[in-house]
A protein has these predicted regions:
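Short, Lys/Arg-enriched, Trp-marked, Pro/Gly-tolerant hinge/linker segments that flank
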Residues: 1-18, 55-59, 65-66
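Basic, low-complexity segments
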Residues: 2-6, 35-55
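A generic structural signal for short
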Residues: 8, 22-23, 71, 142
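Basic, amphipathic alpha-helical hairpins
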Residues: 18-32, 52, 73-82, 103
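A solvent-exposed interaction/effector surface
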Residues: 42, 46-49, 58, 62-66, ...
């Protein structure tokens, strides 16, 4: 936070990230206890709850609920497990009705209808984009858990007075490994960026930009369709360069079915363009 000295800021960030790691490892567990989270941060429950809400814009309970529903949505689209099994895996043990109500409130559909719905085609444009300076962190986990690294990045910037809701947020992926290692980033100039953050640039150039609208749990399937079906049908090919996802909404401030994401795929030069 503004006014903290560097040592105090780093100490607070370490404690907060320690608690976040515990939350991310146990969010699906019956044994998760919000008092234990406070212990992991070496804070009283009152101070932990106050600090968490100040930095994250929501309560720990709201974060846990979002993570559980996000995992449930991904499992509904990417597994054959029954709704009851998915509900148990996502913290709704023995209470499928409660899971159905909560899921519908977040996604606008009950779990069965969400699983059965057909992917739609989204608007696509091709344009030239300028380079963008970024501050980023690497993400070595599955894409499903991308929010974990975004939270770490957000906390680091927040404690240094460098975060605001208008910052452009990105994830950066190798085109053939959308579920593998990647980076998460905010658009920031390199000045005053310090460890553990890294600085870099999203390359400018010619991109196909798909304007996606819907839950994050569908993004990997939408990207695969764009890369391997839609672009070839337009006579375009992806360049051997990272795919960029720009997140246009605060994930905890908008309904999950209303999220907007621009998926930007760098394109190979056309015959008329210089290589």
């Amino acid at each position: 936070m503004p006014g903290m000295n560097r040592d105090h800021t780093d100490h607070t960030a370490r404690r907060f990230n320690h608690a976040l790691r515990y939350l991310h490892a146990h969010y699906n567990s019956d044994s998760l206890d919000l008092h234990r989270l406070a212990e992991e941060a070496a804070l009283s429950p009152w101070h932990w709850h106050r600090l968490y809400r100040s930095l994250m814009g929501e309560t720990p309970y709201e974060t846990i609920k979002w993570m559980r529903l996000h995992r449930a949505a991904w499992l509904l689209r990417n597994s054959d497990a029954s709704v009851a099994t998915i509900a148990r895996h996502c913290g709704y043990r023995g209470n499928v009705q409660s899971f159905n109500r909560t899921f519908r409130a977040a996604y606008g559909l009950n779990p069965q209808d969400y699983r059965a719905r057909i992917h739609r085609e989204y608007p696509l444009t091709i344009d030239t984009q300028p380079p963008i300076a970024i501050a980023y962190l690497p993400h070595a986990d599955d894409y499903l858990f991308l929010s974990n690294t975004f939270n770490r990045l957000k906390i680091h910037l927040h404690l240094r007075g460098q975060y605001c809701r208008t910052l452009r947020a990105f994830s950066i992926h190798l085109p053939e490994a959308l579920r593998g290692e990647c980076g998460v980033a905010f658009a920031l100039p390199p000045e005053n960026i310090c460890a553990p953050l890294l600085t870099g640039t999203i390359a400018g150039g010619r991109y196909a930009v798909l304007h996606y609208h819907g839950p994050y749990a569908d993004l990997d399937a939408v990207c695969e369709h764009l890369l391997h079906r839609r672009l070839p049908s337009l006579g375009e090919q992806a360049a051997d360069a990272p795919v960029i996802l720009e997140y246009l909404d605060d994930s905890h401030a908008a309904p999950q079915q209303q999220y907007r994401v621009n998926i930007s795929v760098p394109l190979q030069p056309t015959p008329q363009e210089p290589v």
